[in-house]
Swiss-Prot record:
Glycans are attached at residues 140, 193. This is U-Kazal-Dg21.2. The record marks 35-36, 97-98, 160-161 as: Reactive bond. Disulfide bonds join 29-62, 33-55, 91-124, 95-117, 103-138, 154-187, 158-180, 166-202. Its main location: secreted. The peptide presented here consists of a single Kazal domain but is suggested to be derived from a multidomain Kazal protein after proteolytic cleavage. Residues 1-20 form the signal peptide. Keywords: Disulfide bond, Glycoprotein, Protease inhibitor, Repeat, Secreted, Serine protease inhibitor, Signal. It comes from Dolopus genitalis (Giant Australian assassin fly). CDD domains: KAZAL_FS. The keyword Secreted applies. May act as a serine protease inhibitor, since it possess the kazal serine protease inhibitor signature. The recombinant peptide does not produce toxic effects on insects.
Length: 202
């Protein structure tokens, strides 16, 4: 999960040829994109989706158009938060930088998520089973008990560099955008910490 605090930073671009290792994409769409994480929100008329950058969205749109499918149009990042009326099969790769807390229940554990997208991502990406419940329930629980407030305990500034690392939780491997992102996700999880396996994608 990525909670980046926007700041004015100078980052040197690293060129990455998008699609070069993926045989599912048409070679006519290969392009050099910087490996800097600057997310944009796209909408294809049915679903919202977050792309790592405008360049990556353009690359995927190229492949969609060659297959006579509808391309994504750039829209406001705030639209990419997962709402209840979204497609239930949609699993966000990254969530918007929005603090609109929701209360989640996982068995006897209650936990505050920064937004509904993060709750959904915990379920579909990490195999958890959080259920959204009334926010008052989380507010009424003492923070000294099992309640976790990620805004206070887990969120911290992360840079926008795409410096992927491969992590393992004992069951599955997962690629995080950088080490800071992995540390936040480990903090937010109620079970099974992520362990760094190596630098680079899994």
């Amino acid at each position: 999960m990525k909670y980046f605090l926007w700041s004015a930073v100078t980052i040197f671009a690293i060129v990455n040829v998008v699609g070069a290792k993926n045989s599912d994409f048409d070679p006519r769409c290969l392009r050099a994109c910087t490996a800097i994480y600057r997310p944009v929100c796209g909408f294809d008329g049915k679903q919202y989706r977050i792309f790592a950058s405008e360049c990556v969205m353009a690359f995927e749109n190229c492949n969609l158009l060659l297959k006579s499918q509808k391309a994504f149009q750039k829209t406001l990042m705030s639209f990419c938060q997962v709402e209840e009326d979204f497609d239930s099969d949609f699993c966000p790769e990254v969530c918007p930088l929005l603090y609109k807390p929701v209360c989640g229940s996982y068995g006897d554990i209650k936990k505050i998520f920064p937004n509904e997208c993060e709750l959904k991502r915990a379920n579909c990406k990490f195999g958890e089973a959080w259920e959204k419940i009334n926010m008052d329930i989380c507010r009424n629980i003492s923070f000294k008990s099992e309640l976790i407030d990620p805004k206070k305990k887990c969120l911290k500034p992360c840079n926008l560099n795409w410096d992927p690392i491969c992590a393992f939780d004992g069951e599955k491997y997962f690629t995080f955008g950088n080490r800071c992102d992995m540390e936040i996700q480990t903090c937010l999880r109620s079970e099974k910490n992520w362990t760094l396996i190596r630098k680079g994608e899994c």
